[in-house]
Amino acid sequence: MTTTDPVQLTADLVRCPSVTPTEGGALVLLERLLTDAGFSCTRVDRGEVCNLFARWGDKAHARTFGFNGHTDVVPIGDEAAWTHDPFGAEIVEGVMYGRGTTDMKSGVAAFAAAAIDFVQDTPPDGAVVLTITGDEEGDAVDGTTALLDYMDAAGEKMSVCLVGEPTCPNHMGEMIKIGRRGSMTAWFTVTGVQGHSAYPHRANNPMNGLARLMDRLGSHQLDEGSEHFDASTLAIVTIDTGNPATNVIPAQGRAAVNIRFNDLHSGASLTDWLQGEADKVAKEFGLEVDMKVQISGESFITPPGDLSDLVSRAVQTETNQAPELSTTGGTSDARFVKSHCPVVEFGLVGKTMHQVDENVDVAHIHQLKSIYSRILKDYFS
């Protein structure tokens, strides 16, 4: 019986300094491991980003279980603030420390270990695919999207996909993500007429219009939530003039808002609403208001059904806890996968991700491998 140690693999990956978009040796390590286990591996590098596609079994099989994860990590920040080497994978009293221990080298290691053992011990009638990117924490332009583009061009398929992001807020097994809110940011530049603050009638203060616009946006209730989502939110994230002089009315003011939106909206519909509000303020104050928008991802939902039931049963069997089906939190690469096949997310407890002394309970890594192993077994049974 094959036994691939997910803790050792996690440690090996953590010791690869793969701060996005640097590959750092992590994908090289995975490619070698998976190739030795009989997987067909293809590097799908695009731009400055390295990605790995790995498949065991027949290409485009009708029953192909897919996994998506990333080996890139966020910067460590001030290394002096760390108690443990951020790339040392030190284990102290059953806890492993290091950047990526939670987000999400442990998830990648747990699934890789589960998949290797599963296909070698009980070869299924089907295929197992891993799509591992080095561009999830960065711009996410040449990562999972590049892998999906490659799959489309090569005729590769996933019937379903599990994303291994840390989904549990506090306790192992408590939450599965079946969807995500959309995310977009809008930047506003309001241009008026500069002047002396003692003679405001000779100027046109852009800050008056900018303040009105931010008040209109910030006080507006986008919705009250939907069946599977909480209410959409709009946060004012910056207001700036770049003006240090208190006796000068500035010529320009700038602000930005970030919107996390549910399935009652789209990036396009919200862009139209924002533009309409900007136009009203421009007309009211006689100002020029320019807007630039970036839509990071649309909201999506994989309705509760076969895939979420499959994962829920495995989680409950291994943890004795019935997981909540949730759409909370930020964006993930599931927003790209959802256009390819049904997708859900399940992984470890994410309390320390991106923090100094990021860490994971090593027992949870073993438990996650057991959950992933059961998911594979049940999917192909």
From Swiss-Prot:
Entry annotation: catalytic residues: 72, 136
GO terms under biological process: diaminopimelate biosynthetic process; L-arginine biosynthetic process; lysine biosynthetic process via diaminopimelate
Catalytic EC class: hydrolase
CDD domains named among the record's database cross-references: M20_DapE_proteobac (cd03891)
Gene name linked to the record: dapE1
Family from the record: Belongs to the peptidase M20A family. DapE subfamily.
Protein name: Succinyl-diaminopimelate desuccinylase 1
Pathway, per record: Amino-acid biosynthesis; L-lysine biosynthesis via DAP pathway; LL-2,6-diaminopimelate from (S)-tetrahydrodipicolinate (succinylase route): step 3/3
Any GO molecular function: succinyl-diaminopimelate desuccinylase activity
Organism from which the protein derives: Ruegeria sp. (strain TM1040)
